[in-house]
Amino acid sequence: GSKGVTNIYVPYSRHDAEGNYAEGGEGRSNYQLPILVSGSTDNPSNVTVHVAHDADTLNILNYARYATRTELYYEDMGAEGLAYASYPESLLIKAGENKGLLDLKFDFRNIDMSEKWVLPLQIVDDASYNYVAHPRKDYAKAILRIFPFNDYSGDYSGTGITNKVVTGYDGDGKPIETAESITKSSIRGYVIDEQTIFTYAGIVDEDYTCLLYTSPSPRD
């Protein structure tokens, strides 16, 4: 994924083929995460893969990327005391198969979608297991950025939206705005619930980046 984080898109509510809730009700969903057995030949025996929460890697990534700007940190869906995500701690991959699907369950009810929610996972190593986790960290660990979607979320054209900057106020207290509108080619709608989305104001978005450049100046 981009910079160590993989975007995962799941429906806000999972439905079956008849349109009924498939995971117990509105705001509940799931995602089947592929787990692979690597090697030059097919997997010769049953392998029970053990999966665990990985708060340490998320903490390292947050500090490396944002340092003391804790308001920008990714939030951990799997943190103790939260019920937004669950998953089995082990997965059986049968002999002759090279892939298993770990069933991640999500409960989006009452979650604050303005936060950047992720689920950090890792494949666990132990001498008693009949496998070895891949030595490359990005093969044995995953930080999943969870994006729920509904019928209204996604990208919309932003060319018709007017965004002006207030530079001051006149003598009557009316705002003085810039003549030109700050435009953005598209805006993204993020899920609140089954029928509701929100967007970020102006040109700012979750992944908005401002680059500052400096040039050396001659000494006096």
List where the protein language model places each region.
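N-terminal glycine/threonine-rich, aromatic-flanked beta-hairpin/loop signature
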Residues: Y169-L212
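Conserved small/polar residues in nucleotide/adenosyl-binding loops
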Residues: Y213-D220
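Short, surface-exposed beta-strand/loop "edge" segments at domain boundaries and coil↔beta transitions
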Residues: L58-I60, Y129-Y131, K164-G168, I203-L212
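Tryptophan-anchored aromatic micro-motifs
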Residues: D151-G171
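Acidic/polar, low-complexity intrinsically disordered N-terminal segments immediately downstream
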Residues: G1-E89, I93, E97-K99, I111-W117, ...
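Intrinsically disordered, low-complexity coil segments
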Residues: R14-A22, H134-P135, K164-S181
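A compact, surface-exposed functional segment
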Residues: D103-L144
